[in-house]
């Protein structure tokens, strides 16, 4: 997968969750010069091996019924993606303008050597500080909306929480799907990642579909 194969497109008139995520995608790209690709929402896909084992992984939709794996890689530089949880909550504040709340995580995967020339230290705290400062900027989400940061994960298995990498590591089941190669190549310096969990509450997105 080369950079030219990544197809980031934005809907012309997004609503609900798409509207919020597209705005955040654009702000991430505008504000973080080291971020090469800001993907939108990830989808949970499955691969099955000959032994009947199922491997779950996050993937971004790339158009034309194609998906891109978001497992640790160096195919398209430093990247981010959104992991959105079920359920999404709707609170009937009023019939015409209910409150809409969703929870999720913003995940980053990056190569420190592409960001810092100095490799005598691990600069993950600097990256975390930069991202958190951006996400807590007043007005980071538009309209009558509020974004709250709730948790930050940095261990590799927790960055991929909810997918098979987490299960493999937590159960000490090191087998299949090239996990040993991930260990050797991507789970050590200069590679690192972040999983920032959040919730967003808004009232200005639901009015378009309430009759």
Which role does the model predict for each range below?
Residues 1-94:
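Small/polar-rich, solvent-exposed N-terminal microdomains that initiate assembly or binding
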Residues 1-38, 95-99, 149-211:
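Short, charged interaction patches at domain edges and termini
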Residues 79-80, 104, 196:
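A broad, low-specificity signal marking well-ordered, structured residues that form hydrophobic/aromatic
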Residues 84, 108, 196-200:
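Hydrophobic side chains in beta-strands
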Residues 87, 111-113, 201-203:
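Short, flexible beta-strand-to-coil junctions
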Residues 56-71, 143-161:
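A broad, low-specificity signal for short, low-complexity segments enriched in glycine/proline
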Residues 93-101, 105-150:
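Extracellular/virion structural assembly segments
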């Amino acid at each position: 997968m080369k950079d030219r194969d990544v197809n980031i497109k934005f809907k012309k008139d997004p609503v609900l969750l798409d509207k919020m995520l597209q705005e955040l995608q654009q702000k991430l790209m505008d504000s973080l010069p080291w971020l090469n690709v800001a993907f939108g929402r990830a989808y949970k896909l499955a691969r099955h091996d000959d032994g009947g084992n199922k491997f779950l992984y996050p993937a971004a939709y790339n158009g034309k019924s194609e998906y891109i794996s978001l497992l640790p890689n160096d195919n398209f530089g430093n990247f981010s993606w959104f992991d959105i949880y079920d359920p999404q909550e709707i609170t009937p504040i009023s019939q015409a303008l209910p409150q809409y709340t969703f929870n999720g995580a913003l995940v980053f995967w990056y190569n420190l050597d592409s960001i810092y020339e100095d490799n005598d230290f691990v600069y993950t705290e600097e990256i975390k500080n930069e991202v958190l400062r951006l996400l807590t900027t007043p007005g980071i989400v538009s309209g009558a909306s509020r974004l709250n940061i709730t948790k930050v994960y940095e261990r590799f298995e927790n960055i991929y929480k909810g997918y098979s990498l987490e299960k493999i590591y937590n159960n000490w089941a090191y087998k299949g799907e090239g996990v040993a190669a991930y260990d050797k190549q991507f789970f050590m310096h200069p590679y690192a990642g972040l999983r920032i969990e959040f919730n967003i509450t808004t009232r200005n997105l639901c009015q378009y579909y309430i009759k």
